[in-house]
Amino acid sequence: MAMARLTPNGVAAALAGDTNLKPVLQIVELRGVQVNGAGVTRGERFRAVVSDGTAASSALFAAQLSDHARSGALRRGSIVQLSEYVINEVGPRRIIVILNLEVLVSECEIIGNPTALSETGSPIPNPTRVEQFNGAPQYGLMAGNSSNTTTKPSDNVPLFQNSMAGNSSNFATRPSDKVPVFQPTVQPSYRPAPNYKNHGAIMKNEAPARIIPISALNPYQGRWAIKARVTAKGDIRRYHNAKGDGKVFSFDLLDSDGGEIRVTCFNALLDRFYEVVEVGKVYVVSRGNLRPAQKNYNHLNNEWEILLENGSTVDLCPDENSSIPTQRFDFRPINEIEDAQNNAILDIIGVVTSVNPCTTIQRKNGMETQKRTMNLKDMSGRSVEVTMWGDFCNREGSQLQGMVERGIFPVLAVKAGKVSDFSGKSVGTISSTQLFINPDSAEAHSLRQWFDSGGRDASTQSISRDITPGASRNEIRKTVAQIKDEGLGMGDKPDWITVKATVIFFKNESFFYTACPNMIGDRQCNKKVTKSTNGNWTCDKCDREFEECDYRYLLQFQIQDHSGTAWVTAFQEAGQELLGCSATELNALKEREDPRFADTMLNCLFQEYLLRLKVKEESYGDERKVKNTAVKVEKVDPSGESKFLLDLISKSSALH
């Protein structure tokens, strides 16, 4: 057969660091190995011996090329052109890491008599039969159709052995008797690799490590550097374990090839780098320890993460602006979330159609946190509930609510949201979640055009069940009479409904309670305080006294529709939505006997509202009563209400 044209001295030139060369080489050996970390198998990678017909060396395929090997597109004898590769240095050894290639010939007989080139770049002397010595690496190269002869080994000795870096087991292949075989040889002591450009010895490299793509990082590298933009920066987290107290933070990096990786710093390194790292800026990061990514906390598409060490460097690139993207998304249409696994981490984008008020939730550990829900829809014909927790509620949540209330329905991109399958599918924020309002992306522009040109009125089906306070996507409309007739609130869990009704009466004698003003972290205590004999206010929860207290709504009013009347209780947020002022302001008007106090109440009477109610049976002494609590109050919008009624008529007509 005709011999394929391999690049002369291609292996030696590649090992010398000439990554501009795109050598044509042959794969003379290929095998898969399992990459393990933290006791967990991380996946299969492929190692090879590549040859230029004269010399050969070990090579490692990047993870993205594994499918080529598994499918058989790459095999022993394949001739390939390396279009992108880097050289990893592990001590004196060098390994070719292949990032991208083109298969020129899928299968071919082994060309020439390739001789193993030491991983330092120095050729190994002519092979002779020797025993393995002190576990040193052995190189065995299969010869092609050659007229050279060698002594046939005994049956007890494998004809081909290779112990490539990072694997302690040998791989043996016995060729037929007709194929000449080189026997294992002992690698000689290290000699400086020849310089193929200037024909002089290579001096010890003290220059900064060469920048490589994030996708090329692996634990077998010695010196490396990556150039990437910070896309996210976590808060400082403090912990306590058997070794004592500590602190940690992490940040995410994105490079120009789209590779992502997380970087983590502990204790003294946190003090060193926390103020240095800023979201949106580009840095060169070098000399860290690669460890298996903790997938319970790390959502990035990378099997490794970087742990910075004392010798690590993080250097700002102030002039870098456009070559590296500011963010990378992998958006999933909302209809695909229906099939996503519980706790999956994913990116979504949609138009915000509703935002509910912020509520306070008490966690199992007794700590309080903020919760806010909103509704997103996209062109897939589905909508989903997104739950914001903690600081997201008052930061992005307040901004989004203000926009929706002004009739502006923004596009929202959610990066690293967590899927929940509790009562349908929903997406919630976690500590590493990022929210982007009206991002400058093709997907966002496409959604905006769709929504403005008719998508606003397009019917959608929610993939989230309507059990959340204030949820409007699957709005459960009830009349006042149905609350009693259907036994709402009598079960183990509350019922959440929407009632269109008129406010007909206020109890204005007591419309507030005195609340604790103490701030616990970034949240107010809000527990009831009592006035002591010295005139101060005492909080039993905080065990403190205060000169002043806060006033929060505990508003009771009566509503009526065509079917009957009911009493409703509104706390701070809903009360403020109804009356248009805070409880502190309203109490001040009452104390001054200001006529505006009565006007505030009167202005709300005999007005029609949409009230989103939590209906739940509660105990009052020996008596059990159903309590209706307003979680959101809004005036009836004629346009929106007309659309709701038309949709209701349309659905009723379809059933008949």
From Swiss-Prot:
Primary localisation category? nucleus
Q: Which UniProt keywords apply?
A: DNA damage, DNA recombination, DNA repair, DNA replication, DNA-binding, Metal-binding, Nucleus, Zinc, Zinc-finger
The protein's location, in the record's own words, is: Nucleus
What the record says about disrupting the gene is: Normal phenotype during vegetative growth, but sterility at the reproductive stage. No formation of embryo sac in female meiocytes and abnormal chromosomal fragmentation after anaphase I in male meiocytes.
Q: Which residues cross the membrane?
A: none
Cross-referenced Pfam families: Rep-A_N (PF04057), Rep_fac-A_C (PF08646), REPA_OB_2 (PF16900), tRNA_anti-codon (PF01336)
This entry's Gene Ontology molecular function terms read:
damaged DNA binding; single-stranded telomeric DNA binding; zinc ion binding
Under InterPro entries, the record lists: Euk_RPA1_DBD_C (IPR047192), NA-bd_OB-fold (IPR012340), NA-bd_OB_tRNA (IPR004365), Rep_factor-A_C (IPR013955), Rep_factor-A_N (IPR007199), REPA_OB_2 (IPR031657), Rfa1 (IPR004591)
Residue ranges forming the DNA-binding region read 225-307
Q: Which family does it belong to?
A: Belongs to the replication factor A protein 1 family.
Query: Subunit notes for this chain?
Result: Heterotrimer of RPA1, RPA2 and RPA3 (canonical replication protein A complex). Interacts with RPA2B.
Q: What is this protein called?
A: Replication protein A 70 kDa DNA-binding subunit A
What organism is listed for this UniProt entry? Oryza sativa subsp. japonica
From which lineage does this chain's organism come? Eukaryota, Viridiplantae, Streptophyta, Embryophyta, Tracheophyta
